[in-house]
Amino acid sequence: MANYSAADVKRLRELTGAGMMDCKKALEATEGDFDKAVENLRIKGAKDVGKRAERATAEGLVAADNGVLVELNSETDFVAKNDEFIELANKVVAAVKAAGARDLEGALAASLDGKTVGEVVQELSAKIGEKLELRRVATFDGKVATYLHRRSADLPPAVGVLVEYTGDSEEAARGAAMQVAALKPKYLNRDEVPADIVADERRIAEETARAEGKPEKALEKIVEGRLNGFYKDNVLLDQPSVQDSKKTVKALLDEAGVTVTGFARFEVGQA
């Protein structure tokens, strides 16, 4: 005679996402001890998650609040809009903030519902049956403007930006966050661009100009012009503003009395 009920099987399936026969076997093996059955299935689930480790997690969402931005990945957009998945992302943001975590390692070790964030993510992964991954985390301590962008109305945000700033104009800071979301700058200012990258851009510009047959006496001016083009594409403060293309982002921020001190941009599935 079975020492468990159909309700136990149903509850175990709902909690772990395991199949009916797996749940029955787990309850039989543990003589109806529900907690041990859950543990056994979670161990099995964890192994299954490991087998799924090479799958791509190109879907998911970004979530942000109180100076914390996270990217939580899934394999499909179906899971990305799952209520439990969205709730987990928001809980992770709160856990990271509470723990004062500064990097992914710290975020995964942060406490959440009596476990670590990493354990909770893995448990939901086992339940849903897809690889889930907390991919990256960014945090700022100062005043922060946040912008989240949805690719479509039925999906959670896929692009998230935090802009840390000083000054009183939240509107100007949010405009900068929208700029970062739209034009994807890699650096805040020219000083942040690594010297080797500047040297490479300068060399490429010079070699290209020579290959185009430009006169030697004009090379320096041409190279500087092309290097400025690189800065306009990649440096936030040098970019033409999406709000007023006749002005740079820096010019608009200066007018508003705002100084951007840092930013982070996450886009689901992108580097």
From Swiss-Prot:
GO molecular function, one term: translation elongation factor activity
Keyword Chloroplast belongs to the record: no
Cellular location(s): Cytoplasm
Chain spans, region Involved in Mg(2+) ion dislocation from EF-Tu: 76-79
Alphabetical UniProt keywords: Cytoplasm, Elongation factor, Protein biosynthesis
Gene3D superfamilies found in the cross-reference section: 1.10.286.20, DNA helicase RuvA subunit, C-terminal domain, Elongation factor Ts, dimerisation domain
GO CC annotation: cytoplasm
A Pfam family assignment: EF_TS
Main location: cytoplasm
UniProt-listed HAMAP family: EF_Ts
Its biological purpose: Associates with the EF-Tu.GDP complex and induces the exchange of GDP to GTP. It remains bound to the aminoacyl-tRNA.EF-Tu.GTP complex up to the GTP hydrolysis stage on the ribosome.
Sequence similarity: Belongs to the EF-Ts family.
NCBIfam families in alphabetical order: tsf
Full protein name: Elongation factor Ts
Taxonomic lineage from the root: Bacteria, Bacillati, Actinomycetota, Actinomycetes, Pseudonocardiales
Gene: tsf
